[in-house]
Amino acid sequence: MDITVKELSKNYGEKEVFKNFSATFKGGKTTVIMGKSGCGKTTLLNCISRLTDYNGEISGADGVSYVFQEDRLLPRLTVYENLEITLNDFKEEEKISKIKQILSATDMTDKATKLPEELSGGEKKRVALSRAFISSGKTILLDEPLNSLDLGLKRKIDEYFLNFSESEKKTAIYVTHDVDEALFVADTVIILDKGKISWAYDFTTDKKLRKITDDESVKVREKLINLLF
């Protein structure tokens, strides 16, 4: 199901972030949002997830999982238990299979019995991402989810996200400043500027077949760099 935003308006005190903003995010696809700091990226995610009040209409965002810039793990639960609580709708065998799969994909199998306080910042981020990936909801909002991770792990998690979001038909809205990351995961990329969409692009190449060196990727990369930096 598409996520539809109609005539969204949002102020923080005297600061106007959005005024009559409208957009459609395609169901089962990943839309990457980019833009300079303060353009409204995080505010838009907060509105879609109903974490803040707003004027306007937002529909289609059901069963939302939100990966914040900071991890929000339950401190008294182990890594395994933090993942397990998102899977109440699944049978026990399915729970075990999903958790084992995501722990392996994120190199966290040996951390399953650890508490959050025993993890590094990057490890906590991986658990937070994993929890969103395996939830039963069909909408994932990601706010710069891989900032604290090294490049190799970023690409590994992006690849898992790519496969999992497609197989589970997840609708994802993914905020990042990393152009290469956007090229890797996006079906559509948009740039926000002062609460408006200043540029948007729908990829024609299947992202599973896409390479950074493809003509389309090179063209989009150059455009993004020119507009953002």
Where are these regions (language model features)?
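Conserved ABC ATPase "signature" region
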Residues: E93-K111, F161-N163
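Conserved ABC ATPase signature
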Residues: L115-L119, E123
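Catalytic Walker B motif of ABC-type/P-loop ATPase nucleotide-binding domains
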Residues: I140-E144
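Helix-to-loop junction immediately C-terminal to a conserved catalytic motif
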Residues: S49
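ABC-type ATPase nucleotide-binding domains, specifically the catalytic core motifs of the NBD
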Residues: D53, E81-I96, A105
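Hydrophobic anchor residue at the start of the ABC signature
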Residues: L129
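Conserved structural motif at the start of ABC-family nucleotide-binding domains
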Residues: I3, F18-N20
